[in-house]
Amino acid sequence: MQADFWHARWANNQIGFHLDEVNPYLMRHLSRLRLQAGEQVLVPLCGKTLDLAWLAAQGLDVLGVELSEKAVSDFFAENGLQPAIDQMDGFRRYRAAGITLLQGDFFALQSGHLAGCRAFYDRAALIALPPDMRERYAGHLQAILPARSLGLLVTIDYPQGEMAGPPFAVPDAEVREHYAAGWRIEELERGDVLGVNWKFLERGVSWLNEAVYLLQRG
């Protein structure tokens, strides 16, 4: 899966993964990240999610990373924000209202960029990637996060043979494999969501579960 794939999806407005509301799991479980006002939370592969503005409204310092320049520009325009724009370490950096978005390759992100980060929130990053890239993504994320970080992870699972991703199925066993070393994993929620996901119903998927995990390092 190459960068051109995602650029084309955004250019053609093929963004069924984008939610027109703040993610309910985030609203229910943000407190589990134990973040204080002003502390930084990372949102990898963030798109133009409304979760960014909601997190900032909770008093947090929000750092998003997104490949698509269109997604980043759309986020600020749709939220009525005029960002300051500059270059930083190969990223195009947009800043406004407590939100910093780094437009560029997530795999170019380094530990120095996250020195002040306390937690991460992943709703649409891990499930956006095919298996080989998921392993690389999880490894890179863990390599650059500070010690004692916390994370909130949302996944989906379904019979992968019944539908081609993205979004891809990420079963519980895979989550635990990716984060086996040095992380405590707590499943916060799991439920059947097939009935409210028409895309999966249309494609004949026989079952669909969503799960939410709290990840604690150290």
From Swiss-Prot:
One of its GO terms (cellular component) is cytoplasm. It is an enzyme of class 2 (transferase). GO terms for molecular function: thiopurine S-methyltransferase activity. It is found in: Cytoplasm. Its EC number is 2.1.1.67. It catalyses: S-adenosyl-L-methionine + a thiopurine = S-adenosyl-L-homocysteine + a thiopurine S-methylether. Its main location: cytoplasm. Keywords: Cytoplasm, Methyltransferase, S-adenosyl-L-methionine, Transferase. S-adenosyl-L-methionine binds at residues 10, 45, 66, 123. Transmembrane segments: none annotated. Belongs to the class I-like SAM-binding methyltransferase superfamily. TPMT family. PANTHER family: THIOPURINE S-METHYLTRANSFERASE. This is Thiopurine S-methyltransferase.
